[in-house]
Amino acid sequence: MAETYYKPCSEFDRCNELIEKYWNTKQFEKCFEGHMELAEKGYPLAECQVGYFFYDGIGVEKDADKAFYWTQRAAEHGDRDGQFNLAYFYEEGIGTPVNMEKAKHWYKKAAEQNHDLAIQKCQDLNLGMNTAQG
């Protein structure tokens, strides 16, 4: 799983350093472009970030459909933040119709990876997840 998640570290690390530089200097468009480059190569962490950029309009125009698309990719590729965010999108109807069954599914998936907010959400929704199952 870690290999799929991070892929070749040297490429990821190089891109991540550049992305961090752009973020710290508030060059958000370049930061978005760097994340998109990694997301298109299948890095779940970058996919999640691209979804967030589209959701919040950071370095790119807000687009709920694209936010949903990239967040869903991240979730399906095992990113726990992506899973939590996708659950939230289903719960709130962001880029997709409201679907509480799918929201619950993704909250559980994120909670199984010890995502604190997902664990709390599962408790709030009485999903029978009193503790993380990592």
Regions found by a protein language model. Name each.
Residues 16-21, 49-56, 85-92, 121-129:
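Hydrophobic face of amphipathic alpha-helices that form TPR/SEL1-like repeat modules
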Residues 104-126:
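Leucine-rich solenoid repeat scaffolds
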Residues 1-10:
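Long, contiguous interaction/recruitment modules in multidomain scaffold/adaptor proteins
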Residues 10-11, 40-44, 56-58, 63, ...:
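Short helix-capping/linker turns of helical repeat alpha-solenoids
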Residues 10-41, 56:
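Alpha-helical segment of the N-proximal tetratricopeptide repeat
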